[in-house]
Amino acid sequence: MKGMFFCARAVVPFMKKSKDGAIVNVGSIAGITGAGSSMPYAVSKSAVHGLTKSLAHALAPEIRVSGVAPGAVATRWWAGREEKMKSMIGSLLLQCIAEPDDVAKLICSLIEQESLTGQIITIDSGQTL
């Protein structure tokens, strides 16, 4: 979370000078649900979501700030736990685990969206519904 804050602080003067910019922070559904791999993880992701909303208020209208909250994503985090990942699929509305490319596409979309700020967008195949 500190890294996100310091990165934003470093880039804001340049974005304000150009009167345009977008920041997209990556949190997690753990920051929304309070459940995750550990309590500190969930709390830190909740802080990321709070930072995102606070920055959106502070930096508008020149800079848009949004967040992405991925659920399960097929990354190396699952190494050694592939069976657990596969067992989750049945409980997901879309019956699939997101790929890193899915998250990247959402981030790119948020950067291009000029009418959106302060929102945390969940990408979790319906896991939190």
UniProtKB/Swiss-Prot annotation:
State the source organism's domain of life.
Bacteria
Q: Which SUPFAM superfamilies match?
A: NAD(P)-binding Rossmann-fold domains
Q: Which Pfam families match?
A: adh_short_C2
Query: One GO molecular-function annotation for this sequence?
Result: oxidoreductase activity, acting on the CH-OH group of donors, NAD or NADP as acceptor
Among CDD domains, the record links this protein to:
SDR_c
Which InterPro entries does the UniProt record give? NAD(P)-bd_dom_sf, Sc_DH/Rdtase_CS, SDR_fam
**GO BP, one annotated term:** fatty acid elongation
**Which family is it part of?**
Belongs to the short-chain dehydrogenases/reductases (SDR) family.
- Put simply, this protein is called Short-chain dehydrogenase/reductase homolog YusR
Encoding gene, per UniProt annotation = yusR
